């Protein structure tokens, strides 16, 4: 994208093996961290996993004794950890949390979306979740024709809306890329753009002004994700919806965003990634906070592009979900 080289990225994969036997085999829950953050093997091996392995069964078991309790496990993983300074710790905990929820759903013999809907949603998961295709990356030798061919492939696969990167080229070149994509998808409302937090305030505002006439789906991460003032100034300067949140890793971070970042409950998009931000347990706290502040959960579009986020979106009734075809 405009900031990092994904070919250099690594990932952590966690398997949580239970003593529950089905069809002659132990049930195992699997988890992996989302794209955009590196593997967390050191934190997992040195701090997070030993705490779980040393916990008693009572420390991890649900109240009825028939399953694991991810919230109890989360508390064990975060024992002896100070608040704040989340760094890569949130990714390590979130990766294990994914594996635990996968295992809990398998023990319950229910899809995770159904389980989440019953526990925290309306009782019934969404039958359909709108999914958009995230692409439009920068590659050597990739011109407008290649970009348009990529977008055509997404439409042929059944996607109705797409997202492309900006900020890795000049503003003039990016506008040409945007116009080339709109020529394929039909109108700007079917296209979102993502700067991956690359811009300073001056450039973020220049892009906001230039993007205004296109009526885009949203303008994503114009500046550093923790620069709430920049985000607020940009949001106030444009009618294009602002999207951000994939690099905020706690309930408190998200609360500060909606307090100080100029985000609007009417059209802004919140993109917190459950696996990168301490997992479903913390994500549920974040959702409760949003509801207290008058935000609909349908403004949430989880980052990640994996099945975990899709099940969360379906189970809790979110707006849409990202796919990385």
Q: Could you describe each region identified by the protein language model?
A:
Residues 164-302:
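Catalytic core of soluble alpha/beta enzymes
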């Amino acid at each position: 994208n405009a900031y990092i080289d994904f070919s250099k990225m690594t990932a952590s994969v966690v398997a949580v093996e239970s003593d529950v036997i089905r069809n002659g085999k132990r049930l195992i829950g699997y988890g992996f961290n989302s794209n955009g953050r590196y593997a967390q093997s050191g934190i997992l091996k040195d701090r997070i996993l030993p705490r779980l392995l040393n916990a008693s069964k009572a420390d991890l078991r649900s109240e009825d004794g028939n399953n694991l309790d991810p919230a109890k496990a989360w508390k064990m993983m975060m024992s002896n950890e100070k608040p704040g300074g989340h760094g890569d710790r949130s990714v390590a905990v979130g990766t294990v949390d994914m594996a635990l929820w996968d295992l809990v759903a398998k023990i319950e013999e229910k899809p995770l979306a159904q389980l989440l809907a019953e526990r925290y949603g309306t009782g019934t998961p969404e039958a359909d979740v709108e999914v958009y295709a995230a692409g439009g990356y920068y590659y050597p030798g990739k011109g407008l024709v290649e970009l348009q061919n990529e977008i055509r492939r997404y439409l042929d696969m059944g996607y109705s809306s797409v997202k492309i990167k900006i900020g890795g080229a000049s503003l003039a070149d990016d506008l040409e890329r945007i116009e080339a994509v709109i020529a394929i998808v039909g109108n700007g409302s079917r296209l979102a753009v993502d700067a991956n937090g690359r811009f300073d305030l001056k450039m973020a505002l220049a892009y906001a002004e230039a993007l205004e006439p296109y009526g885009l789906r949203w303008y994503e991460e114009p500046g550093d994700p923790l620069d709430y003032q920049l985000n607020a100034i940009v949001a106030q300067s444009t009618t294009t919806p602002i999207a951000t949140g994939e690099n905020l890793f706690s309930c408190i971070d998200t609360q500060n965003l909606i307090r100080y970042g100029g985000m609007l409950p009417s059209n802004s998009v919140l993109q917190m990634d459950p696996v990168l931000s301490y997992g479903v347990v913390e994500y549920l706290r974040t959702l409760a906070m949003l509801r207290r502040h008058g935000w609909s959960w349908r403004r949430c579009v989880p980052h990640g592009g994996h099945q975990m986020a899709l099940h969360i979106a379906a189970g809790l009734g979110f707006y849409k979900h990202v796919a990385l075809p």
